[in-house]
Every structure is written in structure tokens, then in C-alpha cells.
Amino acid sequence: MSRQERVQQVMNAFGKKVIQQSRSNLTKGKKNTSKTLYNSLGYNLDVAKTGNFSLSFEMEEYGNYQDLGVSGTKKKYDTPFKYTNKRPPASAFGNWVVRKGLKGTRDAKGRFTSRKGLQFAIANHIFEQGIKPTKFFSRPFGIEYNRLPLDIAKAFELTQIEFEKKIK
């Protein structure tokens, strides 16, 4: 097996581990209601004829907000994203409320609150409190990225051993 093939194998393993651990984190963190984000996670490894590698990861756009979080107007997180003056649309939580099985409750006066009222309350809460960072992708990427130089060095080491065996 050539050096390039070994490095390609290491890069493929890196991509698979990051995606597998990210999906696991989504499921464990109960952030996998619709499975859209889970199914959108993937990676592309491009190998040029010159031997250069390019590895890119893909996910739904809202995955960045789930991963890094969003600061609300009242609660701040260490994130580049924040709500300032525009609330998330209440209609965005319609299907989410149904999938989560949230039922309308009664208010202080005993009146039933509708699903639309519940959606508005959730949107308002997210606007004020933000979205807590889950690091479902960042954490596994960081861990595997720190291991990557060692794995690549091992791939080169194996080819060096094979080279030395051929010389003898």
C-alpha cells in the first residue's frame, strides 16, 4: 500500500469518527427530534493527482447554531451568533411541538393555552434565553483533530518500515 493510500485511509477514518461521534452526541443530547440534522452530517475527501488532500464536513445550516449556540437578549454565551432585535418565527416550532408531544396547558386563570400560544412562548423564550451550545460537532472534531498528526505519522512509519524491508 502506498504512502498516499495510507494517508487517505487515515483521513477517511478521521472523517468517519467525527461524523459517528457527532451523531452519537446529537442522540444522547436529545437534539435529534426530526433526524434532519443527524442525516445531513457527512464529509467529503478529495484527493488531487498531486497527492494533496481536501477534507470538508457538511451539515444543515442550523447545525452551526445547535453546535455553537446562540446568545439571547437576556442570557449570553461565548458564540458568534446572537439574537438582537428579531425573534425566531413562532411558526418554526409548529412541527417541533407536535414531535415532542407537548400539549397545551392551562394558564393561571384555568384557561387552555393553544398550540399557537405555546409556539409563541417557545419562540419568546429562545429569543430571550438563546440556544445553549451543545458542541455536538466541535468536541469530537477537536479530539480527533488532535489525534490526527499521530495517526498520519503512524501511516508514514509503516511505509518507512516497508521501505526498509525492501532494501534488505
List each model region and its residues.
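Charge-rich, low-complexity N-terminal segments
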Residues: 1-46
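Charged, low-complexity interaction tracts
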Residues: 36-168
